[in-house]
Amino acid sequence: MKVILVKDVKNVGKAGEVVNVSDGYGRNYLIPKGLAIEATESNLKMLNEKKKAEERKRQQELEQAKELAQKLSKVGVTLKVKAGENGKLFGSVTSKDVEEALKEKGFEIDKKKIVLPENIKTTGTYYAEIKLYQGVTAKVQVDVVAE
């Protein structure tokens, strides 16, 4: 019996796959528990349409991420921080500080996506890498100046 898995099933397959299982396993376990649906022509057509829609959505998200990466690469951020002698900061600049500075410029980016090369503890120019999407990153210049 061919079924389309609705959810991941251990030792059978992942959601969205069409798998061949024994009739009893399909009718008595997978279908009643909502783990699979029977692989009829209409269900297969629906699955293909769903996959195409997901692919279109992924493409759209990728395009948006590339667009945002271009905009971000042109933006620089200046952070004014209290510093002592020789440009040594009191504390350090974190991804949260960069997130807030980007928010002021109109970019909503989660701090978890911002990767700093190291903890910034001195004044100077650094580059933060922002991971926007799978394989799409943007580099933002971060200038740290004494207050």
Curated annotation (Swiss-Prot):
InterPro entries to which the protein is assigned, alphabetical: Ribosomal_bL9, Ribosomal_bL9/RNase_H1_N, Ribosomal_bL9_bac/chp, Ribosomal_bL9_C, Ribosomal_bL9_C_sf, Ribosomal_bL9_N, Ribosomal_bL9_N_sf
GO biological process, one term: translation
GO cellular component terms, A-Z: ribonucleoprotein complex; ribosome
Gene Ontology MF, one: structural constituent of ribosome
Keywords, ordered alphabetically: Ribonucleoprotein, Ribosomal protein, RNA-binding, rRNA-binding
Disulfide-bonded cysteines: none
Highest rank taxon of the organism: Bacteria
Family of the protein in this entry: Belongs to the bacterial ribosomal protein bL9 family.
HAMAP family cross-referenced by the UniProt entry: Ribosomal_bL9
Described function: Binds to the 23S rRNA.
Stated name of the protein: Large ribosomal subunit protein bL9
Species name: Caldanaerobacter subterraneus subsp. tengcongensis (strain DSM 15242 / JCM 11007 / NBRC 100824 / MB4) (Thermoanaerobacter tengcongensis)
Lineage: Bacteria, Bacillati, Bacillota, Clostridia, Thermoanaerobacterales
